[in-house]
Swiss-Prot record:
<dbReference type="InterPro" id="IPR018221">
    <property type="entry name" value="Glyco_hydro_9_His_AS"/>
</dbReference>
<dbReference type="InterPro" id="IPR004197">
    <property type="entry name" value="Cellulase_Ig-like"/>
</dbReference>
<dbReference type="Pfam" id="PF02018">
    <property type="entry name" value="CBM_4_9"/>
</dbReference>
<feature type="domain" description="Ig-like 1">
    <location>
        <begin position="918"/>
        <end position="1006"/>
    </location>
</feature>
<keyword id="KW-0326">Glycosidase</keyword>
<feature type="active site">
    <location>
        <position position="882"/>
    </location>
</feature>
<dbReference type="GO" id="GO:0008810">
    <property type="term" value="F:cellulase activity"/>
</dbReference>
<feature type="active site">
    <location>
        <position position="831"/>
    </location>
</feature>
<comment type="function">
    <text>The biological conversion of cellulose to glucose generally requires three types of hydrolytic enzymes: (1) Endoglucanases which cut internal beta-1,4-glucosidic bonds; (2) Exocellobiohydrolases that cut the disaccharide cellobiose from the non-reducing end of the cellulose polymer chain; (3) Beta-1,4-glucosidases which hydrolyze the cellobiose and other short cello-oligosaccharides to glucose.</text>
</comment>
<comment type="similarity">
    <text>Belongs to the glycosyl hydrolase 9 (cellulase E) family.</text>
</comment>
<dbReference type="InterPro" id="IPR036179">
    <property type="entry name" value="Ig-like_dom_sf"/>
</dbReference>
<keyword id="KW-0624">Polysaccharide degradation</keyword>
<keyword id="KW-0136">Cellulose degradation</keyword>
<keyword id="KW-0378">Hydrolase</keyword>
<dbReference type="Pfam" id="PF02927">
    <property type="entry name" value="CelD_N"/>
</dbReference>
<feature type="domain" description="CBM-cenC 1">
    <location>
        <begin position="64"/>
        <end position="173"/>
    </location>
</feature>
<dbReference type="InterPro" id="IPR008928">
    <property type="entry name" value="6-hairpin_glycosidase_sf"/>
</dbReference>
Length: 1101
């Protein structure tokens, strides 16, 4: 999971180029600049002139502006740039931005500044006060010089402004450019000679039939071991180019073609790692925009190179090559996503969820049909609109056909005029995936031959890094020399660190990544052991050479990595007992490169606390699992676990720096090691049962922390590994119930995220950003949810895991399976130096069961291929390219396949049998609710069971219970009123196996003192009538009201009969100036209204 900067991986190439003296000084055509300069006016008119205007040119605003007088003649006003060279037959693009203070159409042209005033471009742009960006592309039909001669006027760009408006107006111009497509190579034809091109590593060239042909001998480990190169090409950052050539290869053979740096770091502006060539000459054309600048000369000039080195012999022929500038940037990458109905292309288990996603803008449900292999409709229904799925920026519907249980192959879903890719319904779907995912690790072994008798001829290869030339490792490896990022550390010993697994697409071996990978392989076996399915991983089940030793094959594979990790322990000195962080090449190598052909020197890197604790954890884990098969090795592992634990305690903050990832290998930098301490303590406790390790576990700040985060766990965040093992491996840790509950709670969070996902994924990272290796984050989240099912038997977790797996196998934004060999359209060109069939047909593709890294929306981490594919960005779950040089999205690595291995083994155990019915068990009890009067109270209850239980809510009615009409969901909502105060409720869950009631809960309406909501108003009334006052108040219990009266500002006196919110009193002469108020009272308090006065009108005399 490390950046494989193969575009900078030129350490070996440097020596090759120096030896073959390819750094030739070129004299290529200068980089095509606009013949009119930069075209901006920040520094003045820049050679532009005006005539007939009302005043001089004005560039004070950064644009060139002129005032056009009223009533001007058609040719009487203009803005002109003279001295513009134009070449007949050349294609140009004129670009500019212009405005006019009044709506007007002007004349813009490229032509002659003199008779006969010919033009090669003549246009009439309509302008307004809003800036208009104009682009005109044309091929010149004449030649105009930059300097005028007799009868040969100079070229010009002119804007004729007169005669187009009766009123005075202002014209402004900015960002003017005239670009042409310029050939940058001085020699483009190979009909007769190489010209300034250099050829090496091939036979002598033969020139015939308008082309050059050479024989390649084969046996070349690097693409650059043979090549055709021209140095001296100027390349500019941000400029666009088109590279084309006509070539052939017999037999068919892809070659590596690049535009890049002919020295230094050998960076590339463009690279096509596998330009396909066949026996028939064909023209290949590649448009690109450079993100780098290379000069035409110096120690690292720009170059065009064909790297021809291959393992097999072949003939290469080429007739022409061209590199031209282009005014038009190439379009972005548009993936072929196939039908808009997205399914798990592998299929579905008979008794599990079966959902698909339809990408559609339809606002209403869409009809769907499920068809069998013969096209017969076996089920139908309508979709559920889900709105826009943010991770894909696509509007989606969900199709649910879970009720179909009939097994069969070749099913398809049809909806909205689209037919899905085919899939199966079969209980044995994933049995082979269990083995494919685990078989990846034998092929990743270092230090041993990969035997054809075990894996077949396609994947067989020589042992890598066993001290046989050209290898310089790994039997006697020194420490890296002093580096600033290691504070000058080095060592004076050498170690035999052969063995182990190659980490990813390179030849490096890393303890922290190997640690999580071997840990998950051991977890895969230990889970099967406790689930009663260990026979599925027994001796003879995997493609490994240890068959017949009565040891489960997955443990044989884990042992290979464990023994290598033991060899990485520091033997002596200040850091004795610590573990070296990694071993890898001292410089990057290119692709393809078999391990046995790697010529780089190797070095050990400084120990780290993280690496030391990784070994402590997996050595303890391995000790308990290998003890029945090899007690001596188990004892060695346990002793190493203790030793490294103690060493980490002594050096708790020795971190791997990020700067250590610049040369030859990834950094795997990690300065947060509390999680490694927690994991190691957990494994040591589970193996030994010792109180000291139990204490280390329970006192860790991570023991009660939420370690199951939205973005999942990985090599840099391993506390989840310890928590999962503590929850599942039998032990007597205090508070074990809480540990197990934390796993279930973490899984519930993933279920909540899945409910909002249009593609059913369990991965919902913070901010929606998909990380490097997102496929493994998906897989690790599946591990958590599947473990929750193992702990509880709750069918929700089983269903969520099965549905979450759909994402990896094609139910996603790209309609793409990320597991090689699994699904109709699956990743098969992952970044690897030896699974590199895309670059060399004699090499294999990644093996079936290889998990690709998957979408990565972190643009700062992108490789050049991915950057070129998405110049304008991409929806997070669509940032993926199945291309071997796209290492930031398409790498493969041991810790990603270890996660897949665990999940594959779990899902294979689910089989085809219908789940055994189990009675409902309440998993979430409702709780009492106290809410304000008029508010809604909600009660939620959940239960597990097989089949999934139905739910109905009941309310206490007298001495019995009565169903609440329509209340059949897991949440009940009740309005808080005086009538519902004190009401009791419960949920009843029922399935075929039984029924269970939840706890009884009570709704309580909050008590509240009276609050006046209506004050009485003053009243003016005639004698002999009645005056009416009104008041109101809220409160609970409902307040009582008593009206009061007073005269002349005296004391308030109650009116005993006035106990309504309305008071009606007779109006008499004596009542003049009387005041009234209402007093509201309940058990909580009292509130009085503002007083209201009665004004008496005397009767008319």
């Amino acid at each position: 999971m490390v950046s494989r900067r193969s575009s900078q991986a030129r350490g070996a190439l440097t020596a090759v180029v120096a030896t073959l003296a390819l750094a030739l000084a070129g004299s290529g055509t200068a980089l095509a600049a606009s013949p009119i300069g930069e075209g901006t006016f920040d520094d003045g008119p820049e050679g532009w002139v005006a005539y007939g205007t009302d005043g001089p040119l004005d560039t004070s605003t950064g644009a060139l502006c002129v005032a056009v007088p009223a009533g001007s003649a058609q040719y009487g006003v203009g803005v002109v740039l003279n001295g513009v060279a134009i070449e007949e037959g050349t294609t140009y693009t004129l670009r500019y931005t212009a405005t006019a203070s009044t709506d007007v159409t002007v004349r813009a042209l490229v032509g002659q500044n003199g008779a006969p005033y010919g033009t090669v471009l003549d246009t009439s742009p309509a302008l307004t006060s809003e800036p208009r960006q104009v682009t005109e592309t044309f091929t010149a039909s004449a030649t105009y010089p930059a300097t005028p001669a007799a009868d040969d006027p100079e070229g010009q760009i002119a804007f004729q402004l007169g005669g187009f408006s009766a009123d005075a107006w202002t014209f402004c111009l900015d960002d003017v450019a005239l670009d042409s497509e310029v050939e940058l190579l001085p020699h483009t034809s190979f009909a007769e000679s190489l010209g300034p091109w250099s050829l090496y590593g091939t036979s002598e060239p033969v020139f015939a039939d308008g082309r050059m042909c050479v024989d390649l001998p084969g046996g070349q480990g690097n693409p650059w071991d043979a090549g055709l190169v021209y140095n001296g090409v100027p390349v500019g950052e941000g400029e666009s180019y088109v590279l084309s050539f006509t070539a052939s290869a017999t037999p068919d053979m892809p070659v590596r073609v690049l535009v890049g740096e002919g020295g230094g770091a050998y960076r590339t502006a463009f690279e096509q790692g596998s330009a396909p060539l066949t026996g028939e000459p064909a023209t290949r054309e590649y448009a690109f925009t450079s993100n780098l600048t290379f000069p035409p000369d110096g120690d690292a000039p720009g170059q065009v190179a064909f790297h021809l080195g291959k393992a097999g012999a072949y003939e290469f022929c080429i007739s022409q090559v061209s590199l031209t500038t282009s005014a038009t940037p190439p379009p972005g990458y548009e993936p072929d996503t196939g039908p808009r109905v997205r399914v798990n292309q592998v299929g579905y288990l008979p008794f599990g969820p079966k959902r698909a996603t339809l990408v559609t803008d339809a606002a209403e449900p869409v009809a769907w049909e499920l068809r069998d292999a013969d096209g017969v409709v076996v089920a139908d229904g309508t979709s559920e609109p889900r709105g826009v799925e943010p991770s894909a920026a696509q509007a989606v519907h969900v199709l649910d056909f879970s009720d179909v249980t009939t097994q069969g192959a070749g099913y398809t879903l049809v909806a909205d005029g689209e037919t899905s890719r085919p899939f199966d319904i079969d209980g044995d779907l994933y049995q082979q995936l269990r083995y494919d995912a685990l078989n990846y690790f034998y092929l990743a072994r270092s230090g041993t031959e990969i035997e054809a008798d075990v894996v077949g001829e396609e994947y067989a290869r020589e042992a890598g890094h066993v001290g046989v030339a050209p290898n310089q490792g790994d039997t006697d490896v020194p420490c890296i020399g002093p580096r600033d990022y290691y504070d000058g550390w080095t060592c004076d010993y050498r170690l035999d660190v052969s063995g182990g697994w190659y980490d990813a697409g390179d030849h490096g071996k890393y303890v922290v990544n190997g640690g999580i990978a071997v840990g998950q392989l051991l977890q895969t076996y230990e889970r099967a052991l406790h689930a009663g399915t260990a026979d599925a991983l027994a001796d003879g089940t995997l493609d490994v050479p240890e068959h017949g030793n009565d040891v489960p094959d997955v443990l044989d594979e884990a042992r290979w990595e464990l023994e290598w990790m033991l060899s990485m322990i520091v033997p002596e000195g200040e850091y004795a007992g610590m573990v070296h962080h990694k071993v890898h090449d001292e410089g990057w190598t290119g692709l393809p490169l078999l391990p046995a052909d790697d010529p780089q020197a190797r070095s050990l890197h400084r120990p780290s606390t993280a690496a030391t604790l990784n070994l402590s954890a997996v050595a303890a884990q391995g000790a308990r699992l290998l003890e029945p098969y090899d007690p001596q090795l188990a004892q060695t592992l346990l002793e190493a676990a203790r030793t490294t634990w103690a060493a980490a305690q002594e050096h708790p903050a020795l971190y791997a720096p990020g700067e250590a990832g610049a040369d030859g290998g990834g950094a795997y930098n990690d300065s947060q090691v509390a999680d490694e301490f927690y994991w190691a303590a957990a494994e040591l406790y589970l193996t030994t049962g010792e109180d000291a390790f139990a204490t280390a576990v329970t006192t860790s700040p991570l023991h009660t922390a939420d370690v199951f985060t939205a973005d999942g766990f990985g090599w840099g965040s391993v506390a989840a590994l310890g928590r999962l093992d503590l929850a599942t491996v039998p032990n007597e840790l205090p508070g074990l119930d809480a540990v197990q509950s934390s796993v279930v709670e973490g899984a519930q969070e993933y279920l909540a995220a899945q409910a909002g996902q249009g593609f059913g994924s369990l991965y919902s990272p913070p901010g929606g950003e998909y990380v490097w290796g997102s496929s493994s984050q998906v897989a690790n989240n599946l591990v958590v949810v599947a473990t929750a099912y193992d702990l509880t038997g709750d069918e929700r977790f089983r269903a969520a895991t099965l549905e979450g797996l759909d994402y990896l196998f094609g139910r996603n934004a790209l309609n793409q399976s990320y597991v090689t060999g699994w699904g109709e359209v699956a990743s098969h060109q992952q970044h690897s130096r030896w699974f590199a069939h895309q670059l060399d047909p004699s090499l294999p593709s990644p093996p079936p069961g290889s998990l690709a890294g998957g979408p990565n929306s972190q643009a700062a981490t992108w490789d050049p291929t991915t950057k070129a594919a998405f110049p304008d960005g991409c929806a997070p779950s669509a940032c993926y390219v199945d291309e071997i040089q796209a290492w930031s999205t398409n790498e493969l690595t041991v810790n990603w396949n270890s996660a897949l291995s665990w999940v594959a083994s779990w899902v294979a155990d689910q089989g085809s049998a219908e789940p055994v019915p189990t009675a409902p068990v309440v998993t979430r009890q409702p709780v009492d609710a106290t809410v304000a009067l008029g508010a809604d109270a909600t009660f939620t209850a959940e239960a597990s069971g097989v089949p999934a239980p139905t739910v109905r809510w009941q309310v206490r009615a007298g001495r019995g219970w009565k169903d609440v009409a329509g209340a059949t969901g897991t949440t009940l909502t009740v309005r808080a009123t005086a009538r519902t105060d004190g009401t009791r409720y419960r949920a009843v869950f029922t399935n075929a196996a039984g029924s269970v009631e939840s706890a009884v809960v009570r709704l309580t309406v909050e008590r509240a003192a009276p609050v006046v909501t209506q004050h009485p108003a003053d009243v003016r009334a005639r004698v002999g009538t009645r005056a009416v006052f009104r008041a109101a108040a809220d409160g609970y219990p409902t307040p009582c009201v008593v009206w009061q009266v007073r005269w002349g500002g005296g004391s308030w006196r109650p009116i005993p009969w006035a106990t309504s919110t309305t008071l009606s009193v007779p109006v008499t002469v004596l009542a003049a100036g009387t005041e009234y108020r209402a007093v509201f009272t309940n058990a909580v308090g009292t509130a009085a209204t503002e007083p209201a006065e009665l004004a008496v009108q005397r009767p008319r005399s």
